């Protein structure tokens, strides 16, 4: 996780520098003075990246060294079980579609579509989580 932490630390520093630069340049060249919305958004983005980098640093301390962190690692060092993946599941597609229904409802401010989207998101997320908790005869 050291590489991921370094990556997010770089992103955090980049966004903080860009926030300062953006604030200075908008104060010099914009007619209304400093654009506080953009400056705040860039600064908060840098802060969020710093939070993620700090989390990765703490996780990296607790884990053993991974093949990704070891410079002399071979490809075969990363072989083995990585986890369970369901390649034929339609539930992620349904979660995305129901999330987009809810987002369109929010964008157009249609309360009935927001409620329908939230219900669809909850139902499809439950289907995704409990997909393999049903009996084998159900598949």
UniProtKB/Swiss-Prot annotation:
Protein EC: 7.1.1.9
Cellular localisation: Cell membrane
Pfam family, one: Cyt_c_ox_IV
Record keywords, A-Z: Cell membrane, Membrane, Translocase, Transmembrane, Transmembrane helix
Gene Ontology CC, one term: plasma membrane
Transmembrane segments: 10-30, 36-56, 79-99, 101-121
InterPro entries, per database record: Cyt_c_oxidase_su4_actinobac (IPR021050)
GO annotation, biological process: electron transport chain
Origin: domain of life: Bacteria
Membrane topology: Multi-pass membrane protein
Assembly behavior: Associates with subunits I, II and III to form cytochrome c oxidase.
Protein role: Part of cytochrome c oxidase, its function is unknown.
Protein name (record): Probable cytochrome c oxidase polypeptide 4
């Amino acid at each position: 996780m050291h590489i991921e932490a370094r990556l997010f630390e770089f992103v955090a520093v980049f966004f903080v520098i860009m926030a300062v630069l953006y604030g200075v340049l908008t104060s010099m060249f914009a007619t209304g003075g400093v654009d506080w919305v953009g400056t705040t958004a860039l600064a908060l983005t840098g802060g969020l990246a710093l939070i993620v980098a700090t989390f990765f640093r703490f996780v990296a301390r607790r884990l053993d060294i991974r093949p990704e962190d070891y410079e002399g690692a071979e490809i075969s060092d990363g072989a083995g079980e990585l986890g369970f993946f369901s390649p034929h599941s339609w539930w992620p597609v349904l979660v995305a579609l129901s999330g987009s229904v809810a987002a369109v409802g929010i964008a157009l401010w249609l309360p009935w579509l927001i409620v329908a989207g939230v219900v669809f998101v909850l139902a499809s997320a439950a289907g995704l989580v409990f997909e393999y908790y049903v009996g084998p005869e159900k598949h």
